[in-house]
């Protein structure tokens, strides 16, 4: 990117601001006091929230939106420039045919991918960036929640909505930032956090990657830019191809720095004894289900300890973490049928989600899966893996 993000007062305009990743950035910038506008052809509860904190929202995407800060009398009075040209932010979903995007190019607006804004924010904080094919949202939310409960007051940017901060982002006052770092379009390579986390690595996003090696290369670049790497060595690819500074695993025989024993998977949560380099720290109780969430929590334990928290503080925080929206989210119960909503769309995610559902099911109760495939390219690439991923369902 030729241009550098200007944090000296120049306004921001987001094309497609209603998306989960874009809206989080718009929210943080607005809360920091920057002038922010955004457009989206599908207004939703997220855009309504942005409007409530002062973001100027447009329900149509058209070139005139880029002139808002010139038309706005307050902006004109507070700017020393005659032409208040915004910095334009796009996601991968916005292509060259978009009318606002074309107008931004024509008018010479600085144009940034959303990952450029996130990377710029990451560089301003003691940042913890959570990467991985699966578990990014839950792990980053867990870490943010744990730090919040411990009084650290972090800034948080995640790819899901969390009840504790009523959305997908919160602005804290401490020097810490917890961010979800996305690999789907290769933009992971832009981030240089103090601490990087890898939850796992698999081939996904076949519209962007052809082979696992291509995915690994992206993660290799990312890890080379992390001052400290924390990674789960239960993943074979991570174990064989990366050298984390701090490792974690669900197996006591893995040689990991952090591991668990005495695991108790229950219908109402999970408990395990946590170990740190051969020393028992104590029992961790979670109200979220499944081995995948225990692994996510172990990443949070490793981060908490790295930041100097006592295990008791960590355990108390994680014990009340209820998860993010659409991550094994309880939606209600009718006639004895419990409805769970989950974003899982990769075979590995489906298997983990249904295994957690099986743990929660009462004796004699069936587990019925209703699945909506996400993207033709993913369904076509993993067609042989999808069938066995439903083995925990009836």
Q: Model-predicted segments: where are they?
A:
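Acidic, Mg2+-coordinating active-site environments of NTP-dependent enzymes
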Residues: 47-51, 58, 65-69, 78-90, ...
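Active-site beta-alpha connecting loops in nucleotide-dependent enzymes
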Residues: 10-25, 35-42, 324-326, 348-350, ...
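Switch II (G3) loop of P-loop NTPases
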Residues: 176-184, 339-345
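Generic start-of-chain signal for non-secretory N-termini
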Residues: 1-13
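Conserved motor-coupling elements within RecA-like helicase/translocase cores
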Residues: 170-175
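Walker A (P-loop) phosphate-binding motif
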Residues: 12-14, 28, 115-161
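Short beta-strand "acidic-cap" motif of Rossmann-like dinucleotide-binding folds
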Residues: 35-40, 155-157, 178, 247
């Amino acid at each position: 990117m030729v241009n550098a993000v200007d944090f000296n007062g120049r306004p921001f305009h987001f094309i497609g601001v209603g998306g989960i990743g874009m809206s989080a950035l718009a929210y943080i910038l607005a809360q920091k006091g920057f002038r922010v506008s955004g457009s989206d052809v599908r207004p939703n509860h997220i855009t309504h929230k942005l409007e409530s904190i002062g973001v100027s929202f447009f329900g149509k995407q058209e070139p005139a939106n880029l002139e808002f800060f010139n038309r706005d009398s307050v902006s004109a009075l507070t700017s020393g420039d005659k032409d208040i040209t915004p910095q334009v932010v796009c996601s991968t979903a916005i292509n060259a045919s978009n009318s606002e995007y074309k107008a931004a190019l024509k008018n010479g607006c600085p144009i940034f991918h959303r990952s450029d804004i996130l990377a710029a924010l990451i560089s301003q904080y003691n940042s913890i960036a959570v990467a991985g094919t699966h578990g990014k949202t839950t792990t980053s939310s867990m870490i943010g929640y744990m730090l919040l409960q411990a009084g650290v007051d972090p800034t948080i940017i995640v790819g899901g909505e969390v009840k504790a901060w009523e959305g997908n982002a919160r602005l804290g006052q401490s020097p810490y930032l917890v961010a979800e770092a996305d690999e789907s379009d290769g933009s992971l390579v832009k981030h240089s956090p103090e601490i990087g986390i890898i939850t796992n690595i698999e081939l996904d996003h076949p519209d962007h990657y052809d082979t696992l090696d291509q995915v690994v290369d992206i993660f290799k670049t990312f890890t080379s830019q992390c001052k400290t790497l924390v990674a789960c060595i239960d993943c074979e690819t991570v174990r064989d191809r990366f050298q984390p500074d701090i490792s974690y695993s669900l197996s006591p025989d893995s040689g990991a720095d952090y591991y668990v024993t005495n695991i108790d998977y229950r219908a109402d949560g999970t408990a395990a004894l946590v170990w740190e380099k051969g020393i028992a720290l104590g029992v961790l109780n979670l109200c979220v289900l499944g081995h995948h969430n225990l692994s996510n929590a172990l990443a949070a334990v490793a981060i908490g300890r790295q930041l100097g928290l006592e295990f008791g503080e960590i355990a108390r925080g994680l014990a009340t973490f209820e998860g993010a929206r659409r991550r094994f989210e309880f939606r209600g119960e009718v006639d004895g049928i419990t409805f769970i909503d989950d974003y899982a769309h990769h075979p590995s995610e489906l298997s983990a989600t249904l295994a957690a559902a099986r743990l929660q099911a009462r004796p004699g109760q069936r587990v019925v899966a209703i699945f909506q495939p996400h993207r033709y390219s993913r369904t076509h690439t993993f067609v042989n893996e999808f069938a066995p991923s439903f083995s925990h369902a009836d």
